[in-house]
Amino acid sequence: MRKSLFSLFVSMALLVSFSTPSWAKVVDLDSLQAQLSQNEVVRGDFKQSRHLEMFNQPLTSTGIFTLSKSHGLLWQQQIPFAVNLVLTQDKLRQTFANQAPKTITAQENPMAFYFSHVFLSVFHGDTAALKEQFTLDFSAQDSGQWQLVLTPKQAPLNAVFKTITLSGNTHIDQLMLEELRGDKTEIEFTQQASLPKELTDAEKAQFDF
């Protein structure tokens, strides 16, 4: 469970950090960083494909997500089965179908939340913190498409991942996590929108612990 949670931490934090308004055109790393955290809320669909060395076919899941700068991440897997995950700065609640929810805190599992906090430093515009953890390789095309490859430089990240690659245009469209042991996770994000600008009452209720 810890590794799957880590993948979600990475996805959440990088999405929050690099979501940009629809009019923005990212041409270099500076312009990418300059547009951090422009939207209070980002919603969309996701498709996650987990490629494992032991299986010929990827394990695929789909659902919807809601990201809030002030509240955290609401990650709602719908297929192949329902999973509701709520992540805040210091708490995580996971609910499978009609089972009772399970909650962990940063105090109970500091290592898991360490990963989230590392990437959330980008959310605050702390590019120095990102460069402490990764070697950054950025490229952009005239069309506005861009790619950022993160190569971990130190433990514990470099003990798990070979590279983390983000690509997109005005938003992150794809996130790929390549592990040292050969496994790979690809997450595609579509239908991203930032309206309404605030969480609905139903969305806010999800973040009540």
Please report, for each region that a protein language model flagged, where it lies by residue.
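Positively charged n-region of N-terminal signal peptides that target proteins for export
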Residues: 1-4
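Sec/Tat signal peptide C-region and signal peptidase I cleavage site
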Residues: 18-24
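Short hydrophobic/aromatic-rich beta-strand segments that constitute the beta-sheet cores
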Residues: 46, 73-77, 92-95, 148-150, ...
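Bacterial N-terminal signal peptides
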Residues: 7-17
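Polybasic/polar functional segments that serve as interface/processing modules
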Residues: 24-52, 58-66, 93, 99-101, ...
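Gly/Pro-enriched, hydrophobic low-complexity segments
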Residues: 127-209
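Flexible, processing/modification-adjacent segments and terminal tails
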Residues: 25-28, 35-37, 43-45, 50, ...
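An acidic-aromatic
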Residues: 64-113, 185
